[in-house]
Each structure stands twice: as C-alpha cells, then as structure tokens.
Amino acid sequence: MTKKYNIAVIGATGNVGRETLNILAERNFPINKIYAVASNNSIGKKVSFGEQVLQISSLDDLDFEEIDIAFFSAGSEVSKKFIPIAIVKNCMVIDKSSFFRLSEDIPLIVPEANLSTLKDFAIKNIISNPNCIAIPLAVVLKPLDNEISIKRVVISTYQSVSGAGKAGMDELYDQTKSKYIFEEKSPNIFPKQIAFNLFPHIGDLNKDGYTSEESKIALELQKIIGDHLKVSVTSVRVPVFVGHSISVNIEFSSKVDAKEVEEILEDADGVVMISQTKDLAYISPTEVVGEDAVYVSRIRDDESKENAINLWITCDNLRKGAALNSVQIAEELIKTYL
C-alpha cells in the first residue's frame, strides 16, 4: 500500500500557493490530509484543490507535529519565523522564499540539475526552492556544463508581473484599463508604471549597482552549477501577466557550436527544444502558460566571440519557476528518503 502524507501549503491564497495545490492534485501526490494555510487576514477564504474546495486555516494555529511536508510560499519573513518551529516538530520543509537559499548546509534543488545534493536535506530538514529565473536557467545550463564546461553567462531576463504576486497582476490590469478611459493610476507595487512600459529594476538596488534579484540569480546559479561559473545578470520587469523569458549568451571553455548545443538540449530532462528550421522558431511567454517544460529557442552562434552561443528561454514562472519544482522535490523525497 502506498504511504500517504499530511501536507501543508503555507501561503495558499497567493499565486504560487494556489499553483502548488493545483499541481499536487494534478500529479496525484499521495496525500492523507491537505492543509491550505495562510495568515489570519485570509481566514474565511477558500481555495481549490482538484475537485475539492478547502477552507483556509490560520498559520498561527497550525500544529506542525501533524504535518509531514510543509510547502512554504509566503515570503522570507514568514519562513524566518515559522520554519524553525516546523523543523523542531520533525516536519520536512520545502521553502520557496529566498531566506535559506544560500545557506551552506541547506540544499538548493532543481531536480533536473543537482538531484544528488538532495540527500543533504537531513542536516536541517529544509530544502530550498531556487529563484524563478535560476530554476529554468539551471535546467538548461547544467546539462551543457556537464558536456562542455561553461566559462561565463550573460543573462537578460524579461520577468512577468505575476512574480510580484497577485497584487502585481492587479496593478498591471488596473493601469492598462485606466489608459483606455484616460485616467492615471499611480504605481504602488512597482517603482514605475508597468502598463505599456518596462524597467530594469526588480528587488532592491544594491550599492554595487545590481539589484537584489540580479544578485540572487547569479549566486544561486553558482551554488547549483558550480563556483567556476561567471554570471552577469540584468533583470527587467515587463508588462506580461504570466511567463518569464530569458536571453542568454553562453561562453564555453572549449570549442562548440549551436548545432552541438541544440543536440545536447534535445536530450535534456525538462527541456523542449524549438528547432531553428521551423517557421517562427521561437516561443513567447503567453504560449507557455500552464506548461511544465522549459522551452529553448533561437539557438545561434555568437559571431562576435569564439566558443559562444546565444539562446532564448521561456517558461511558466508559477509552475516550473516555482510550484512544480517544489512538488518535484517532494516527489523525489518520498520516493528515495521518506
């Protein structure tokens, strides 16, 4: 008989929390009891879980001793406060915030890239889910680095407003609507107007000129792939509701061309390659909404530099960029360790 688990999704009313519930139901995760958990402000709300409707329960009242696996999707402050309580009660935690990602003794996992480090979860009973851009990048870069060592990557991201939560999506919607009725909506969630606009500012601005988002992506990729990887990132917020896109220039340590890179990625787990021979041989963010794969297109040689190629990555940031990755981690946990 298959063992079943008591599961809690913390932050269940948010974009990623809701998607986590959807994916757990879609993939028939072996669940005995499911808890949809949020702050006291969400008490009385309901969320979907497959064909069920779940009542939101309060995080303050949650007894972690009854929970086998907790998915934290409520931000760093909640993780900082409640995860230490959870692990004392022997609850296994998969954290989607940035709080623990760079801790040396906590694994930062992308199953297609570094599953061998999952065993380290036992040190603290915590596994970190990477940044929504670091995940698809790791899915693509790790198999390439395994075959032909990567020297350097230059990354420009085009990140949808859902990365800033439901409030970010609402702000884009409201500003877009207001433009058609000649009203002005001041920015609240974002630093500048997001409707019909874009800006290279996600997270806080650091003293070195990079944003906190750009620093996270670089440091997380190095933790997942290796310190030998040199990374430069520019992160851009774009007026798209769901779906992140990434332009990547990859410089390899030895001779390689676009055809060889395409052949490697065609065999890579979690990747869908769009051949350059097709008409409209690229994928846009609206085409990947609801999809689990990381899509790669527009692979081409960099004619300005030897041993370098350019490519375009697109994925659903709420699924593989967040919720799906965490559920895949849980599936591997129960398959191998629990």
Curated annotation (Swiss-Prot):
Protein residues bound to NADP(+): T13, G14, N15, V16, N41, S42, S162, G163, N317
Annotated positions binding phosphate: R101, K216
Biological or metabolic pathway of the protein: Amino-acid biosynthesis; L-lysine biosynthesis via DAP pathway; (S)-tetrahydrodipicolinate from L-aspartate: step 2/4; Amino-acid biosynthesis; L-methionine biosynthesis via de novo pathway; L-homoserine from L-aspartate: step 2/3; Amino-acid biosynthesis; L-threonine biosynthesis; L-threonine from L-aspartate: step 2/5
GO molecular function: aspartate-semialdehyde dehydrogenase activity; NAD binding; NADP binding; protein dimerization activity
Membrane-crossing segments per the record: none
Annotated substrate binding sites: Q159, R237
Keyword terms: Amino-acid biosynthesis, Diaminopimelate biosynthesis, Lysine biosynthesis, Methionine biosynthesis, NADP, Oxidoreductase, Threonine biosynthesis
Pfam families xrefs: Semialdhyde_dh, Semialdhyde_dhC
Subunit record text: Homodimer.
Similarity section: Belongs to the aspartate-semialdehyde dehydrogenase family.
Protein name per UniProt: Aspartate-semialdehyde dehydrogenase
